[in-house]
Amino acid sequence: RDSSTSRGLGDVYKRQIPGRSVINMTAETTLRIARDFPNVIGIKEASGDIEQMQRILDNRPEGFLVLSGDDGMTLDLMRRGGDGVISVAANAFPQRFMECINLAKRGAFDEADRAFGRLREAVDALFAEGNPVGVKCALASMGLIGPTMRLPLVEGSEALRSRFEKLIAEYDLR
């Protein structure tokens, strides 16, 4: 047990993001980590596999948090017993996204689905040219930051900026 999770680093969350790591950590591995390392208190689950997420939810130790790492799957995960989200979209549209999450936490999933439906196109746009380019482009479109990015990142395209300007105006996302 000579690992970072057993050397007193405090509570940690495991990140399950196959899109970044190129491999998927199985539900069984997640559950073994949850049982064997008590300071791993939860997982940011972005496998895109709702059945895998359900196996984790059904078999997790008491107190182990399962947080969505995929904004578009958050309400489905919470509906199944998930605990919340570590969100990209909340960086660009915090009030609107939190409205969806707070409705879901109260069990008002139909209302949460409707609220997210008004946000879905903008959330999808955040990932059109990759993260964090989409978030930065959305914030620049609202006049909150400048469009300049540090290498190796590049500014969002003119098409993406135009798309955000339209969506921000249409859905009152400022």
Language model feature labels by segment:
Residues 1-13:
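Single conserved hydrophobic/aromatic residue that forms the stacking wall/gate
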Residues 3-6, 46, 68, 87:
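Short linear Ser/Thr-Pro motifs
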Residues 4, 51, 114, 118:
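Short, conserved clusters of charged catalytic residues that mark active-site
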Residues 7, 28-35, 55, 99, ...:
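Alpha-helical scaffolding segments of alpha/beta enzyme cores, especially the outer helices
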Residues 2, 18, 33-36, 137, ...:
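Preference for short coil/turn "hinge" residues that link or interrupt alpha-helices
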Residues 11-78:
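Ligand/cofactor pocket segment of small-molecule handling proteins
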Residues 72-174:
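Structured C-terminal cap/extension of enzyme domains
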